[in-house]
From Swiss-Prot:
Protein name per Swiss-Prot or TrEMBL: Aspartate/glutamate leucyltransferase
Source species of the chain: Brucella abortus (strain 2308)
GO cellular component terms given for this protein: cytoplasm
One protein family per Pfam: ATE_C
EC code(s) of this entry: 2.3.2.29
Gene transcribed to yield this protein: bpt
Amino acid sequence: MTHQPQQSPQFFLTAPSPCPYLEGQQERKVFTHLVGDKANEINDLLTQGGFRRSQNIAYRPACEVCRACISVRILAGEFEMTRNMRRVWSQNRDLIGRVHKAQPSTEQYALFRDYLDARHRSGGMSDMTVLDYAMMIEDTHVNTQIIEYRRRGPDSFMSAKGDGELIAVALTDVMADGLSMVYSFFLPHMQERSLGTYMILDHIERARAAGLPHVYLGYWVEGSRKMQYKIRFTPQEHLGPRGWQRFEG
């Protein structure tokens, strides 16, 4: 009998459930657990192969009749802002992002709840408790960080710290070839700031500064309004049967 090495991931398939993006479709996912000494390495390989991480699980769509979910990653080194993106970047120049270990706080959860209640009241995460949120942040065996965005204070140029209320948060995996944006949320009443766009732009700049070629955005579904923003950040690559292919929009 051949024994599977302990570090080799085992994969499982979920039962069919309603698709959250395309009405009338059923989704299934293949998933594995990210645990052990090789969790970082496995997460890198799986993300490069179209998987996403949620807590200590890596998953990707494995639907029987639909292939609409397409993995997207931005080519950070080649990216150029559009006029509108430059406006968003300038509009948020009073913000500063500070990197922290992946640890939850009551301040983060309060912002998270405000965001869900305003933007995703009927979504699958709408009933998450403070303990659920803590698990989302802490239950990880990979190189994960929290970036908290606040307004710049009088000493920010020295301390690199923001001042005042928490405005936005990004949960981000640091990979060998890029940054993977796992989840982000922000003050919902600041719509004029386009904070979701700003955080993606900030991650592109962070990837460039670290010499990392990619920013992973997860899945794009053509025809899904909630996913449409992802293809505005070009050039980017889409994962298909022939591997990662360049996409200019």
